[in-house]
């Protein structure tokens, strides 16, 4: 059977096609999405689908929840409620880095930069914590920079940084150090009434010690009673300060009474050795040497149960040294140095060496005193400015200026800065020994060191210079200090009298001239009479009146010139404003003014003529519509 050609070709095309496997669709699996055995399964399925599809909550529901939250009224906070201070947990991250940077500046003795950096940080993204502020305040307190301390404290209060108990204690200490116990007690009362904090044991110790130092033992006793009312436990340190106040007042019975009171409150035995030194002084004052030495054995004997700190040892050493028992003090000092084992036990401190220095100096053993003073470094104690001043004062009082100047040279080696007392002490000692130039050099160094000597030190300098016939030097120091010191009339009279006696009346008048130019200085009538009298001696009694009249004339001319300058400035401003107005606007203003003037004169304005013409065209002068044809 034959097939046609067309059919054969069609058969070949069919064979040449590639066989394609037909993929059948998978059978439908019936999954029950809308039916669950429990609500928990349904919720779990919803959460799974949201995670799989990464679905977010609907926008409208999110906005609705925000609106509901915004509609909830917030409680109104009282702005007068004091803020609570931050906890130490706030000192992390950048704020901790800032704190460490401030500590670095303080270690470098750059307190001005530390305080300035703290101020600037308040308005930065890294606000300082109260702990950083307290660090700067404490450094300023140690260096007796009380003005800077109070300024920084006022600044942080305005900045809203809540103080903590340490801040309050530093302020109390500052006012007590500058002998302002009344202000310190006012701040304490405000703290008790308003602060959201409770006082600490350190608060009462600072107040009691400061009040005793300011000879206000009665107020210190009241603070002790207030301490008991507030529920604080009996503190032997507070009692030791009160006993010290009784010793200052030569009240031996008060010392023994306080000790008995403390002993009763502690159950019959005082195990803190801080009170035994003052108790020994009380016994020595009553000439009860036997009881004093028994107290000494009870405190530091071999079988003693009394806990002795460095401060307790210092009080005992002081009691022995001041009452003819310096040999016993030396034995105790040697034993204490052996017992000293930092950091486990601190048996000596800076005060220990100061007590021994005073004991050696009282016995005239100044070489031994300087040797003990230089041993501080061996026991990890660094002398401060007060320690140097204490020993230098003892040396200067005993005409040992050379040794005092050696100690002054050691201050720079130990990175200790002299203060006003240091320079004043050396200056006065130089004057006593007739070394006027050396004393004046110490004063000049003090001024160049940015220290602020008071008027009394300046007066002593001027007195010695005038007595030595160094009027030019005295005038030079006057010119240096007149803008730095608030001089009284006596200071002006002193230098003026010296100039007058030397026949230098022109220089005296120049001083008056400068006083008249200075608005902060008042030339009193008493001073004017003094100047007139000095001028009368030289036959120039009218010069002062001429000078004052000339000053009044110059002031009047200056005031008139100031008013003229202000008027010229005002005219210049009006000219500048006129220059900003375009010329066309100026012409329009002139034309408007001309029309107004013609109207007032009774003439007919062109604008009125135009309006009348328009009225005629519209239907007459009465404004009615024209009749229709």
Swiss-Prot record:
It is found in: Mitochondrion. The keyword Repeat applies. Keywords: Mitochondrion, Repeat, Transit peptide. The keyword Disulfide bond does not apply. Its main location: mitochondrion. GO terms for biological process: embryo development ending in seed dormancy; endosperm development. PPR repeats lie at residues 129-163, 164-194, 200-234, 235-265, 272-306, 309-343, 349-383, 384-418, 419-453, 454-484, 488-522. Signal peptide: none annotated. InterPro entries: Pentatricopeptide_rpt (IPR002885), PPR_domain-containing (IPR052308), TPR-like_helical_dom_sf (IPR011990). Residues 63-79 have a biased composition (Low complexity). One of its GO terms (cellular component) is mitochondrion. GO terms for molecular function: ATP binding. Residues 44-79 are annotated as: Disordered. Pfam families: PPR, PPR_1, PPR_2, PPR_3. Residues 1-34 form a transit peptide. PANTHER family: PENTATRICOPEPTIDE REPEAT-CONTAINING PROTEIN (PTHR47937:SF5), PLASTID TRANSCRIPTIONALLY ACTIVE CHROMOSOME 2-LIKE PROTEIN (PTHR47937). Belongs to the PPR family. P subfamily. May play a role in embryogenesis. This is Pentatricopeptide repeat-containing protein At3g49240, mitochondrial. It comes from Arabidopsis thaliana (Mouse-ear cress).
